[in-house]
C-alpha cells in the first residue's frame, strides 16, 4: 500500500513538473521562462528570442510586428520559432544572456546564440531569420517557385543568370550573403527569366510601393549592388519612425532632406507628394525623409534642429558624414522648383552650414558663471589673456542639473581671479563650427596664451575642479567620467 501511495505521489509530481515546463503560446509567440527555456532551445533548431520589459515603449511597438512574423512563419510551416522572455521576471535568463537593454533579440541556431541585427517590422524579421537558416539566395527553378517566393516576401531581390557559375552570379551571391536584412533569390531558368522580362546577369528588386520594381543598372560589383539594395528598398520619400530609423541611418545615402510636416494638417498631400519626381531624380545622392510634428516622440528631433512644431511645414538638410552638418533654406517657399534649387546648391558645395544660436542675454556676464552663445563664444573662450573653463550642457540633462550647484560654487571661488573665467553654453541652442558636442555635460578648458583645448575628465567635484584649474589643466592620469544615464547622450543618428 505504501509503495502504491509513493508511486502515485511520484507520478503526480512528474505531471506537475511537466506542466510547469510547458510552453505557452501568445499570438504565435512562445513564452519562454527559466523552467522551459533550456528544453525549448533544445527542441527547436532555430529560435529567435526577444528579451523585453512590459514597460518598455520600444518593446510595445515591436510586439504586434513580432507576433505577425511568428504567425506568418507558422503558416509557412517554417522550422523557425519566435519566443519572448519577460526579463523583469526571468532575471536569471536576462543575466545569463547579458541583456543590457530592451528589447534585446538573440537568434539561437542549434543552441548557439548570435545578436539579431535586422529591422523591427514583420517582413524584416522574417527576411533576417530566413537568411540565417538557409542559403544566401534561394534557387528558383520554376515560374511557380518565383511567384511563391515573391508572394512570401514583400521586398525581394532576384538575380537572373543563365550561368550560375559566372563571375556576375558569384558577386551576386557574395552580396546576398553579406546583407542579412534582405531576401535574395536566384534563377537560371529560361522561363523565369522570360516571365520577368529580365536580361542575362540582370538583377531586379521587387517591392510593394512606388514603381513596384527596380532594375539594377551599371557595373555589377559588390559596392554597387549593396547600394542598389539599400537605396531601392526604401520608398522614394520615407516616413521616419522607430521601424524605419535603422534603414534610414544605416543606409549608404548620408545626405538627407528632412520634411517637417503635420499629417493631420494635410502637409503630405500638399507639399510632399508633388516632390516624388525630384526624389527619384536625386535618390542616389539624397534621401527624402518626412518627420511628423504630430508624434510626441519627435520632440527631441525638433529641439536638435532648434525648431518648434509651430514652424511646420518646413525643411532642413543634414549631412551625417560630416559631424551632422545642417543646412537651412533661405526661403520658406516649398515649391518643387525652390527645393530643387536648394538641393543643387548643396550638391555643388555652395551652401553654408546652418548653426544654431541664441540671442546674447544683456546680463550674460552679471553672475560668476558667464553665459556663452554662438556669437560671443570666440571673444570670451578664445581670449588669450584668460583661461576659460566652459561647460557645454543641455537643459534636460540630469547630470548637468546635478553639476549646477557645484559649478556655481566653483565660479564663486574664482570670480575675483583675473586669469580664469568660468562659463557655460546651452549646446542644444548654440552650435560651433569648430567644436562638436556629442554628450552632456562636456567640459573643456581653453588655456590662456596658446588657446590649447583640454578636456576635463576628472570627477565632477569641487575639489577636482580646483585641482584641475590650479594645475592649468595639466593633470596627469585623468580618467573619463562614466555616464550611466541614457538621457545624457546628445541625439544619436538613429534617433533622428
UniProtKB/Swiss-Prot annotation:
Residues 476-489 have a biased composition (Acidic residues). Disulfide bonds join 56-59, 397-400. It catalyses: Catalyzes the rearrangement of -S-S- bonds in proteins. NCBIfam families: ER_PDI_fam, pdi_dom. Pfam families: Thioredoxin, Thioredoxin_6. Residues 19-134, 349-474 form the Thioredoxin domain. Expressed in all head and body tissues. Belongs to the protein disulfide isomerase family. InterPro entries: PDI_thioredoxin-like_dom, Prot_disulphide_isomerase, Thioredoxin-like_sf, Thioredoxin_CS, Thioredoxin_domain. It is found in: Endoplasmic reticulum lumen. CDD domains: PDI_a_family, PDI_a_PDI_a'_C, PDI_b'_family, PDI_b_family. Homodimer. It comes from the Eukaryota. One of its GO terms (biological process) is response to endoplasmic reticulum stress. The record marks 460 as: Lowers pKa of C-terminal Cys of second active site. One of its GO terms (molecular function) is protein disulfide isomerase activity. The gene is Pdi. This is Protein disulfide-isomerase. A motif (Prevents secretion from ER) lies at residues 493-496. Participates in the folding of proteins containing disulfide bonds. PANTHER family: PROTEIN DISULFIDE ISOMERASE (PTHR18929), PROTEIN DISULFIDE-ISOMERASE (PTHR18929:SF240). GO terms for cellular component: cell pole; cytoplasm; endomembrane system; endoplasmic reticulum; endoplasmic reticulum lumen; extracellular space; fusome; neuronal cell body.
Amino acid at each position: 500500500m505504501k509503495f502504491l501511495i509513493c508511486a502515485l505521489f511520484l507520478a503526480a509530481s512528474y505531471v506537475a513538473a511537466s506542466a510547469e515546463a510547458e510552453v505557452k503560446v501568445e499570438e504565435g509567440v512562445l513564452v519562454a521562462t527559466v523552467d522551459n527555456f533550456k528544453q525549448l532551445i533544445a527542441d527547436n533548431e532555430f529560435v529567435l528570442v526577444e528579451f523585453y520589459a512590459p514597460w518598455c515603449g520600444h518593446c510595445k511597438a515591436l510586439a504586434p510586428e513580432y507576433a505577425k512574423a511568428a504567425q506568418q512563419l507558422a503558416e509557412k510551416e517554417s522550422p523557425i520559432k519566435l519566443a519572448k522572455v519577460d526579463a523583469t521576471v526571468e532575471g536569471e535568463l536576462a543575466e545569463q544572456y547579458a541583456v543590457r537593454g530592451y528589447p534585446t533579440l538573440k537568434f539561437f541556431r542549434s543552441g548557439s546564440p548570435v545578436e539579431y541585427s535586422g529591422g523591427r517590422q514583420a517582413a524584416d524579421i522574417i527576411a533576417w531569420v530566413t537568411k540565417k537558416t538557409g542559403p544566401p539566395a534561394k534557387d528558383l527553378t520554376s515560374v511557380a517557385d518565383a511567384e511563391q517566393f515573391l508572394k512570401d516576401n514583400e521586398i525581394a531581390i532576384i538575380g537572373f543568370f543563365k550561368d550560375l557559375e559566372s563571375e556576375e552570379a558569384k558577386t551576386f551571391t557574395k552580396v546576398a550573403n553579406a546583407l542579412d536584412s534582405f531576401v535574395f533569390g536566384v534563377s537560371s531558368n529560361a522561363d523565369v527569366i522570360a516571365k520577368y522580362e529580365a536580361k542575362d546577369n540582370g538583377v531586379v528588386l521587387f517591392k510593394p510601393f512606388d514603381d513596384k520594381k527596380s532594375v539594377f543598372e551599371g557595373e555589377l560589383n559588390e559596392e554597387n549592388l549593396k547600394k542598389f539594395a539599400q537605396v531601392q528598398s526604401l520608398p522614394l520619400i520615407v516616413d521616419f519612425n522607430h521601424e524605419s530609423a535603422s534603414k534610414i541611418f544605416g543606409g549608404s545615402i548620408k545626405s538627407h532632406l528632412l520634411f517637417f510636416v503635420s499629417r493631420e494638417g494635410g502637409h503630405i498631400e500638399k507639399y510632399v507628394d508633388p516632390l516624388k519626381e525630384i526624389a527619384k531624380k536625386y535618390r542616389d545622392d539624397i534621401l527624402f525623409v518626412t518627420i511628423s510634428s504630430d508624434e510626441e516622440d519627435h520632440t527631441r528631433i525638433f529641439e536638435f534642429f532648434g525648431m518648434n512644431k509651430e514652424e511646420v511645414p518646413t525643411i532642413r538638410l543634414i549631412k551625417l558624414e560630416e559631424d551632422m552638418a545642417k543646412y537651412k533654406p533661405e526661403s520658406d517657399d516649398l515649391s518643387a522648383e525652390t527645393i530643387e534649387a536648394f538641393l543643387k546648391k548643396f550638391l555643388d558645395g555652395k551652401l553654408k552650414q546652418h548653426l544654431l544660436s541664441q540671442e546674447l542675454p544683456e546680463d550674460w556676464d552679471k553672475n560668476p558663471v558667464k553665459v556663452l552663445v554662438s556669437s560671443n563664444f570666440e571673444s570670451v573662450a578664445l581670449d588669450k589673456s584668460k583661461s576659460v573653463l566652459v561647460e557645454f550642457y543641455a537643459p534636460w540633462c540630469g547630470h548637468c542639473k546635478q553639476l549646477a550647484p557645484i559649478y556655481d560654487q566653483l565660479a564663486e571661488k574664482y570670480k575675483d581671479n583675473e586669469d580664469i573665467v568660468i562659463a557655460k553654453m546651452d549646446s542644444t541652442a548654440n552650435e560651433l563650427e569648430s567644436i562638436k558636442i556629442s554628450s552632456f555635460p562636456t567640459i573643456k578648458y581653453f588655456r590662456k596664451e596658446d588657446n590649447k583645448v583640454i578636456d576635463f575628465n576628472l570627477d565632477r567635484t569641487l575639489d577636482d575642479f580646483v585641482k584641475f584649474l590650479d594645475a592649468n589643466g595639466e593633470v596627469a592620469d585623468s580618467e573619463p567620467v562614466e555616464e550611466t544615464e541614457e538621457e545624457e547622450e546628445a541625439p544619436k543618428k538613429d534617433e533622428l
